[in-house]
From Swiss-Prot:
Matches recorded under Pfam families: Anticodon_1, tRNA-synt_1_2, tRNA-synt_1g
Phylogenetic lineage: Bacteria, Bacillati, Actinomycetota, Actinomycetes, Mycobacteriales
Chain positions of motif 'HIGH' region: 72-83
GO biological-process terms attached to the record: leucyl-tRNA aminoacylation
InterPro entries, sorted: aa-tRNA-synth_I_CS, Leu-tRNA-ligase, Leu_tRNA-synth_edit, M/V/L/I-tRNA-synth_anticd-bd, Methionyl/Leucyl_tRNA_Synth, Rossmann-like_a/b/a_fold, tRNAsynth_Ia_anticodon-bd, Val/Leu/Ile-tRNA-synth_edit
Protein name: Leucine--tRNA ligase
Origin species: Mycobacterium sp. (strain JLS)
Amino acid sequence: MTETPTAQPDRAADADTPQHRYTAELAGQIEGAWQQTWAVEGTFNVPNPVGELAPPDGTVPADKMFVQDMFPYPSGEGLHVGHPLGYIATDVYARYYRMTGRNVLHALGFDAFGLPAEQYAVQTGTHPRTRTEANIVNFRRQLGRLGLGHDTRRSFSTTDVDFYTWTQWIFLQIYNAWFDRDANRARPIAELIGEFESGVRTLDDGRPWSELSAGERADVVDSYRLVYRADSMVNWCPGLGTVLANEEVTADGRSDRGNFPVFRKRLRQWMMRITAYSDRLLEDLEVLDWPDKVKTMQRNWIGRSTGASVQFGTDAGDIEVFTTRPDTLFGATYLVLAPEHPLVEQLAAEQWPDDVDGRWTFGATTPREAVAAYRASIAAKSDLERQENKTKTGAFLGAYATNPANGQQVPIFIADYVLIGYGTGAIMAVPGHDQRDWEFAHEFGLPVVEVISGGDISEAAYAGDGLLVNSDYLDGLDVAAAKAAITDRLVADGRGRARVEYKLRDWLFARQRYWGEPFPIVYDSDGRPHPLPESALPVELPDVPDYSPVLFDPDDADSEPNPPLNKATDWVHVELDLGDGLQTYTRDTNVMPQWAGSSWYELRYTDPLNKEALCAKENEAYWMGPRPAEHGPDDPGGVDLYVGGVEHAVLHLLYSRFWHKVLYDLGHVSSREPYRRLVNQGYIQAFAYTDSRGSYVPAAEVVERDGKFWFEGAEVFQEFGKIGKSLKNSVSPDEICDNYGADTLRVYEMSMGPLEASRPWATKDVVGAHRFLQRVWRLVVDEQSGAVRVANHEALDTDTLRALHRTVAGVSEDYAALRNNTAAAKLIEYTNHLTKEGVTARAAIEPLVLMVAPLAPHLAEELWRRLGHDTSLAHGPFPVADPQYLVTDTVEYPVQVNGKVRSRITVDADAGKDTLEAAALADEKVQAFLNGATPKKVIVVPGRLVNLVV
C-alpha cells in the first residue's frame, strides 16, 4: 500500500479548540488524502473473468455483487444535496458487501445526450460536446468529494463514440430481427427470409416468394422487423422544430422545455415494436424484486385487457371496434372515431342529412368542413388533455354504421376523447353504462339504452354488474355469460372475434435534433432504407454550421421537421457498396431519443473497454447471469441492486427491459431481465420562498424575523417542496463538505430517514452528524496530544460485549436491507455507550471503526491506520456477531400517528430513544400511513409507546 499523506490538525480553530479535534479542516485533509490513496491503489477496481479487466490468472471470486445507480444527466448547474442521496446509499451498500468479502462492481457513468446541451449550443454557438464534457468534469469533481467507491475505469458517457458505437450496434440487432409469435421470441430476420424461400412460411395472398420482385420482398420483410417506419401520430412542436415524446409534453399540451404549443400530426417516423413483448413484459414482473407501486405502474402502462373485436358495417367498409364489454353491444347507440382515424375522410358525407340535429354539426355547413374545423380545434391538445373530465365535444360525419347485434343504424361521430393510439381508434358508445359516453349522449341528444339492470341511468351511467335486459337472446344472463354468448354469436356471424388488447403503443424512436446518436441507416435513390453493416460503425456525429433544427412559428401546425443534420451535406450524401456495387446513398438525419443509451448501459459496466463486442458473454454471465441457488429457480438474472427515482418507473425501465429481452432472445446475454432488484429513493425536500407575485426567491438570502420571512426588505412566504433549481432552494454539497466534511454529509443524509421516504433538509441539523463523528474520533485519538488512546489488552465487561455484538448484528442487518438510518442510530447508541462508560479497549473500538466505515469511509480509514493497520479496511473484515451475546429480552412498542395506533414494533428491551425513533419511522405500515410526510415531532415514552405527530 502506498503511504497515505498524514492529515494535519486544524490550526485555524480558536485558541480554546483542542489542537487535534476532528474539524471541517481536518476532515477535508483526511478526505483528500484517502481519496488520493484509493485512486492510486485502485481500491475499488474489480476484476472480470475475461478481457482487459481480468486478473493474470483469470480467477474471480464466485461471490459477486453488482450495484448500480440511475446515472445522472450532467447539467450545467452541478449537484445539489438532493442528488447524492441515492449515490451515497448505494455506496454504503456496496462498501458493506465489499467488506464481507464480495467482489462488488459499482461504477457511475453519465447520460449526456439530450436537449439541454443542444439548446445551450444553439444559444452560444458552443459545440454540445464541449459543454457536456465540462459539466462531466464538474460532476466528477463533486461526486469525488463524497468518497464514492466507484471503479472509475468503468465510467463512461453515452456521448462517447466508444459507447454509442454499441448503441448503434444494438439498434441494428433489433432492426435485423422479427418476433416469432409461435416461438414467443425474437429471431434474426435472415431466418424469416429463409422460411419464405424454403416455403416453410407462405404469404397471406398465396403468391410464391420467387415471384415477388426485390422491392416486394423488401416490403414484406420490413413489415416483420422489430424496427420499422410508419406514418404515426406524433407530438410536433414547431417552436422547437422537433417531434417530442409523450413524456416531453405537459398536461396542457405544451413542450416541457420552452413552453411552446405542441400539435398532434401524422409523420413518417422510426418505431420500435415493443408491443410484441407486451405479454412477456407483464409476466416477468412477477419474478422481479421491485416495489409493488412500480410493478402496478408498468402493468397499467401496458394495459392488457380482454374483450372482443366487433365489425360495424358502413358504406366505406367495416369499422373495427375493440370493446372489453361485448355484453353491452345491444346498448351501443352511436360510434365515435378518433379524429385521426384513417376512415374519417371516406366516411364524411358531402352534405348533412335533412334532419340533422344542429348540435351535431360543429357549426359547419358540411360534414367535411366540420371534420376540418374540429381537427384544427384539437390539434394542440395532448392525449392527457383530451381525456380530462370536461364538456364533451365532437362532430357528426353525416354517416351511419350497422350495429351487428340488432341491425340498427347508429350515427358516427368524431370526438377528442377517443385516441387513435389505443385499440382501433374507434369505440362503440354505450351511454347507459359508460360515463363518458353518457355525458356525450346528453350533450348531443343521443339515445341512452339500459342493457344491464341494477342502476338508474337517468342520473348517470351504471357501470356495475347485473342481469342483461333489452338484449334479445342475452336477457337474463349475467355479465360473464353474456360476454361469452355474444362473442360466440359474433364469430358465427363473421362480425367479430375474441381479442386481447393493450394500451402499450410501439416506441417512437426518432428525434429531429442534433445532439443524439445518429442512425446506422441510409436510403437509396428510391427512398428505401438500408441498414449499414457492422463494419461501418460507428456512424459519428458530424459538425454542422449550427445546431438548431429549422424553427417555425410556434403556432404553425402545418410545418414539417427539418433536422439539423441535413445541414451536414458532405456527411448526408455518401458512396457505399452494400452488395450491389458502389452507389450514392443518403443518410438518415434523425437521431435517437435520449432513452437509447440508458436502455442498455448496465451491460457496458460489465465490460467497458471491450472493442470487439458489446460485452464478453463470460463477463455478462458472471455479473448478471441467473443465480438460482441464491435467488430461486425463477431468477431472471440482472443487476443485483438498482437505485433511482420513481419518476423513471415506467418509460426508462420498460424500454430497457424491452431491449434486454431482444438481446436475450438473440443470444447476446444470459439474463432475461436487466434489473433483478429495484429500490426507489425518496426526495430531499427543503423550504422555498415566494414573493407577492408568486415568484421564487433565493432561499439562502431569506431571513427570519419575528416568525416572518423577508427577502430584500419585502415579506416572502414559506412553502415546502422538492429541493432544486426551480424552487431556488438548492444547497450545494460543496458547501456542506467545506463546512463539515464529506463524511458528515454522508452520515447526515443517511440518518434523515428511510431511503424510500422523502425527507426535509435542514442545514442547521448537519452539525449533529458532525458531532457524532467527533465522538467516534475521540474514542481513538486524544484531542490534546493526537496520541492513540486505545488500550490493547483491556477486557470487555458483559454489558459492553452485549452492546457490541447486538450492534454488529443489527448494523449488519440494516446495511444489507438499506436501512442506513437505523444503522446510524445503532452506531450512535453504541458510541454513546463507549463514551459514557469510558471504554478504551481495542476489542470494543476497532469493531466500531469497521462498522462506521460504510457510512464515513474517510474517517474510518484514518482511524484504522492510526490504530496500527497498514492495509485499507475497504475490503474488510466486517465484524461478525457472537450469537451468545445476542440473547436478550425484547419489548413490543405500539406506534401511534397523531395519537392513534397504526403499527407495532419489536425492539431490544434496552433500546434507546434514537433506535426506537428510527425503528418506528422505518416500519412499513407507518411509512404507508405517512405517505411521504415527515413527522413534526417524535415522542418516545420508554417502555410504553412511540407517537409521531404529523
